[in-house]
Amino acid sequence: MARALVNVPAKVKRGDVVEIKVLISHPMETGFRPDPNGKFYPRDILKSFACTYDSEPVFSAELFPAVSANPFLSFTVVATQTGVLTFSWTDDKDQTQVQTAKIEVE
């Protein structure tokens, strides 16, 4: 599966619009590229990404083969309360990976 680098500010003020950045380390192999032997690499893409803020959905995206390797996603949320951001992504094999980050609101 993939690893992710998540950038979430540790402390913010209530009502601030916060930019969340996620870089997912993943090959996003389309299945159309030949290997050195002329066979095709098997398809291996992430098909969806979602983020929740204290269990409330705040962002979601469908990913397609045209998305480059190591997808970078950036979106904003309004900081309303101290809580946990939960990031999840699912690949072609329906394997889901989850990562969390805490955000503290002053």
Language-model segments: which ranges?
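Short acidic/polar inter-strand loop motif in beta-rich domains
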Residues: 91-99
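Short, charge-rich binding segments
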Residues: 76-79, 95
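Short strand-edge motifs at loop-to-beta-strand transitions and within beta-strands
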Residues: 71-75
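Contiguous segments within soluble domain cores/interaction surfaces
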Residues: 4-10, 14-63, 68
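Short, aromatic- and glycine-rich surface loops/edge beta-strands on solvent-exposed regions
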Residues: 83-91
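Short beta-strand edge segments in extracellular beta-sheet folds
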Residues: 102-106
